Design a protein with these regions (language model features):
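Conserved catalytic segments around the Walker B and adjacent sensor/switch elements
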Residues: 5-23
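Interdomain hinge/linker elements that couple catalytic modules in large macromolecular machines
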Residues: 118-302, 308, 316
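Structural recognition of the conserved hydrophobic beta-strand(s) that form the central parallel beta-sheet
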Residues: 75-81, 102
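Short glycine-rich substrate-engagement loop in P-loop NTPases that contacts/grips substrate
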Residues: 17-46
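Short regulatory helix/loop adjacent to the ATP-binding pocket of P-loop NTPases
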Residues: 84-100, 112-117
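A cross-kingdom feature that marks ATP-driven nucleic-acid transaction machinery
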Residues: 1-11, 245-396
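Conserved P-loop NTPase "ATPase switch" module shared by AAA+ and STAND
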Residues: 43-61
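Loop/turn-to-beta-strand initiation segments
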Residues: 46-49, 72-77
Length: 396
């Protein structure tokens, strides 16, 4: 998209150099060969735009990139699929000279755009505004109908190419999973010379455990105990993995951006806690692929969706603790802070009280919201907004 943007704004093809280091054309290059290759193709008396995908495959790539920055009139775009690209040892070379942009799977609104749907608003007979979604043939849908598809298939852009077909989606997600696991974890660790992360079966079991426990308080010890006690490990395995080994595998999953970890924050004490955190999976379609598309745990699924939507909107997100109660998310940036509860439904009185109680205990004046998957009438109660999940996700 950036290359297209440049061309649409008058940048000529000879100014753009694109290299994908998964291609056999480039994957055996050294840093010195990369430097010479680019220099030989520079435009005369014009700025160059260099695009390097998966450049971490090149040993000492950072030396070449730093030399381009010093020696050439150019803009440099480096893309990769894991945090290893910007690990501390490499980021040091580029500190203060680069901007990191994290790219997530599609939001619900982007999912609709990719599939050719349009969101329109009209006045509701009961007051306020009502959203409807239309396809290219003009057929209309309730937002919840399309949200159900998003919760099933997830936000990987490739889903738009195969359509909302379960078998085709499974094939696509299987390819994504295999690529992430084989290339971005096992192969990367092998190149690093690490010997801890070598077992694809153990890696898959840990991934499935975390996918099945999104939004639950989870410790490394609990992962290890569950794998052993429920006999989920390969019976031919010699010995049980240590907690240290499990920690290494989980760390690799976080580094590959398959899972994100969220920490707890004491609202009254105003400090992060060293108690159990939670994990969320980067794409809910990937979770459904791993667990067989079984329809369960909707509450944690929509919690997962809300967490990543908050990240897309530029918030730092933590779990809130107020006395002995928990707030699902504290979302903060330089301008604002929001306390957010997420629930499948607000229609039952006991659920309503459970979700509202922690927010009532917070004495500051920041915005407090409950996002409900099933909410008959969005209202404000005790200064707390209660809104539908679809409205939150479609709010721009």
């Amino acid at each position: 998209l950036m290359v297209l943007h440049l061309r649409q704004n008058g940048v000529s093809d000879d100014q753009i150099i694109e290299m994908n280091f998964e291609s056999m054309d480039f994957r055996r290059m050294t840093a010195e060969e990369l430097y010479r290759y680019v220099k030989e193709r520079l435009p005369e008396k014009k700025r160059a735009y260099l695009f390097f995908d998966e450049i971490q495959r090149i040993d000492q790539w950072q030396d070449a990139v730093n030399s381009f920055r010093v020696d050439l009139d150019c803009d440099i775009y480096v893309t990769g699929s894991n945090a290893y690209l910007l690990s501390s040892e490499y980021a040091t070379y580029l500190a203060g000279r680069s901007v990191e942009i994290k790219v997530l799977p599609l939001s619900f609104r982007e999912f609709l755009d990719f599939h050719g749907y349009v969101v329109r608003e009209s006045k509701s007979p009961t007051g306020g505004m009502r959203k409807r979604i239309y396809d290219t043939d003009g057929e209309s849908y309730e937002p919840q109908e399309l949200l159900d598809a998003y919760l099933r298939f997830g936000g990987m852009p490739g889903i738009a190419d195969v359509g909302l077909d379960t078998d085709k989606a499974l094939a696509l997600l299987d390819g994504i999973y295999s690529t992430v696991v084989v290339r971005d974890i096992l192969e990367r660790e092998r190149r690093r010379g690490q010997r801890q992360i070598t077992d694809p079966d153990l890696l898959r079991k840990i991934i499935m455990f975390l996918a099945d426990n999104i939004g639950n308080s989870t410790s490394i010890t609990s992962i290890s105990n569950t794998l052993v006690n429920e006999k989920l490990l390969d019976q031919g395995r010699k010995g049980n993995p240590s907690v240290h080994t499990i920690q290494a595998y989980v760390g690799a999953l976080l580094e590959s951006y398959i899972f994100y970890e969220i920490k707890r924050f004491d609202i009254k004490g105003k400090e992060y806690l060293r108690t159990l955190g939670k994990y969320y999976i980067v794409d809910i379609g990937l979770r459904n692929y791993l667990l067989g598309f079984r329809d369960m745990d909707t509450g944690h699924i929509i919690e997962n969706i809300v967490y990543f939507e908050l990240l897309r909107r530029g918030y730092d997100v933590s779990i809130g603790k107020v006395d002995n109660k928990e707030v699902d998310f504290i979302a903060a940036n330089a301008e604002e802070k929001r306390y957010i509860q997420v629930t499948e439904s607000m229609n039952e009185p006991t659920t309503r009280e459970r979700e509202l109680a922690p927010l009532r205990m917070i004495r500051d004046n920041y915005e407090k919201i409950v996002i409900a998957g099933n909410c008959n009438h969005p209202i404000t109660e005790d200064g707390i907004k209660i809104i539908r999940l679809t409205d939150f996700l479609l709010d721009t």
